[in-house]
Structure formats: C-alpha cells, structure tokens
Amino acid sequence: MVLSAADKSNIQAAWGKVGGHAADYGAEALERMFLSFPTTKTYFPHFDLSHGSAQVKGHGAKVANALTKAVGHLDDLPGALSELSDLHAHKLRVDPVNFKLLSHSLLVTLASHLPNDFTPAVHASLDKFLASVSTVLTSKYR
C-alpha cells in the first residue's frame, strides 16, 4: 500500500503527539486486543496477562519501539522491519490475522487518547500505515 505525502505527514504528526506515551499506548493496545480477541492470548502462554503486568508493559514498549522505527522509515518499511518480519514468520509463527487485530486495537487506543487530533484523514492515514506494517511483517511467511 502506497502512503501519500499527506499520509506520511499525518502519520508523523500523530505519532509525534503520542510522544513519551508510546510504550503505555502499546501496552494498552495489547490489553485491549487480549480482552477483545481472547484467542490472541495463545501466543503469550508464559505472560502474566493481567492489567498492568510488567510483561504486557514490556511487550507494549517493544511494539511501540517498532512502530516508532517504522514511522522514521516510512519510505523503507521492509528494510526497517526486516528482522521483526523474520522473527514473527520463522520463530514465533504468529498467524497474520493477529496483526490486523492489534492494528485495530491500536487505532482505538490512539483515538481514545488523541480525540481532537484523530480526524478522519488521520484515521485513514494511520490505518494505511498499520496495514502496510502488517503487510511487511507477514511478507516472509511465503
């Protein structure tokens, strides 16, 4: 999916407003995903999935860091996310549908924290961005 110049601007502006809350929002999105889509818990059998657990917060920070890296490399998402793609495809073997579920949960989380900035255009741009990230992360499944 091609991101337009307007999309890139919207993504960078929105992620800039996330700022120092990225790890918290990542953890919140994971918690939201686990509650809304309980089957996603199967990939984390060794985690304490209770609200506010250190493991969920830690993984939320990893998700946020990966997305921050992706925002910084919008013109080369495959290069920026290559190692993460290998990890999820070959070692973790995460079902690709789960990336869509996490993307949805992240959009809801961002909308709840940035209501004045989450315009339809920003929503569409972030959705395209997360779909592009998901496509990259599942590209090595073949």
UniProtKB/Swiss-Prot annotation:
Keywords of the record: Heme, Iron, Metal-binding, Oxygen transport, Transport
Top-rank taxon: Eukaryota
Coiled-coil zones: none
Tissue specificity as recorded in UniProt: Red blood cells.
Binding-site residues, heme b: 88
Residues where O2 binds: 59
Pfam families reported for this sequence: Globin
Gene3D superfamilies: Globins
Globin domain span: 2-142
GO BP term, example: hydrogen peroxide catabolic process
CDD domains: Hb-alpha-like
One Gene Ontology MF term: oxygen carrier activity
Any GO CC annotation of this UniProt entry: haptoglobin-hemoglobin complex
Keyword Cytoplasm: no
Family per similarity comment: Belongs to the globin family.
Job of this protein: Involved in oxygen transport from the lung to the various peripheral tissues.
PANTHER family, sorted: HEMOGLOBIN FAMILY MEMBER, HEMOGLOBIN SUBUNIT ALPHA
Assembly information from the UniProt record: Heterotetramer of two alpha chains and two beta chains.
Name of this chain's protein: Hemoglobin subunit alpha-2
Taxonomic lineage from the root: Eukaryota, Metazoa, Chordata, Craniata, Vertebrata
